[in-house]
């Protein structure tokens, strides 16, 4: 069971310090989703991380920075996936050259998981449970549907939405290969790296 963490879209006190502590504790990938940051601001944010952790950073915007800053990967949003043939060709060639480049995306429909023909390093399915970040966003899938569809996925699927340490065993039972932490990390009264450690410990007990 893999555990990844997504950044808060808003500013968080000592966010990079907390993420570095997570890396030290065993975090494999940290997804940087900062839609409000300019390219310059995002670059400055990334530069707060030691170089030894750059390959564990996956960015959701300004994908060119993945090459210039030697980052781990890119996450393709709906906007990126809707771009034309030239963009897809450029991405295909880039993956041929940068063979270790992590490429991910998010699914919001179960049918898309089995119909997707493109190859990704891993994918997110959201929202699996009631969101911690957005109180009005409820889990979108029945347990029965997940048990049927997740095993049919052609690539690794990680559960996102309402995920915390207590959910890890259930996520594994549903067939997911990983879990995505967001609200449980950044909205907790505990330090974010402590929340991550608890989830990682739960995953190791499976």
Model regions: which residues?
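Generic hydrophobic/aromatic pocket-lining and core-packing "Φ" positions
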Residues: 19-20, 46, 63, 113, ...
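Structural motif
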Residues: 25, 69, 118-119, 152, ...
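Boundary/entry segment of secreted carbohydrate-active catalytic domains
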Residues: 1-13, 203
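Catalytic beta/alpha-barrel core
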Residues: 6-9, 18, 28-41, 50-115, ...
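Glycine-rich phosphate-binding active-site loops on the catalytic face of alpha/beta enzymes
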Residues: 5, 74-88, 122-137, 168-205
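Glycine-rich adenosine-cofactor-binding loop
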Residues: 107, 142-145, 154-165, 171, ...
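Surface-exposed amphipathic alpha-helices with a cationic face
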Residues: 23, 43-51, 86-98, 114-117, ...
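Charged helix-capping and loop-helix junction motifs
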Residues: 44, 137-146
């Amino acid at each position: 069971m893999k555990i990844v963490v997504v950044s808060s879209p808003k500013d968080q006190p000592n966010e990079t310090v907390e993420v570095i502590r997570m890396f030290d504790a065993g975090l494999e990938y940290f997804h940087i989703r900062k839609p409000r940051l300019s390219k310059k601001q995002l670059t400055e944010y990334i530069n707060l991380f030691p170089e030894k952790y750059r390959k564990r950073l996956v960015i959701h915007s300004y994908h060119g920075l993945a090459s210039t800053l030697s980052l781990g990967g890119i996450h393709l949003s709906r906007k990126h996936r809707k771009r034309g043939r030239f963009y897809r060709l450029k991405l295909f060639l880039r993956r041929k050259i940068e063979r270790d480049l992590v490429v991910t995306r998010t699914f919001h429909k179960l049918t898309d998981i089995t119909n997707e023909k493109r190859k990704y390093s891993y994918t997110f399915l959201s929202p699996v449970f009631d969101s911690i970040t957005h109180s009005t966003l409820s889990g979108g899938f029945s347990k029965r549907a997940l048990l049927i569809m997740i095993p049919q996925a052609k690539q690794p699927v990680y559960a996102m939405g309402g995920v915390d340490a207590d959910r890890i065993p259930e996520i594994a039972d549903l067939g997911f290969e990983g879990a995505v932490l967001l609200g449980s990390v950044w909205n907790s009264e505990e330090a974010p790296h402590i929340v991550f450690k608890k989830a990682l410990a739960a995953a190791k007990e499976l």
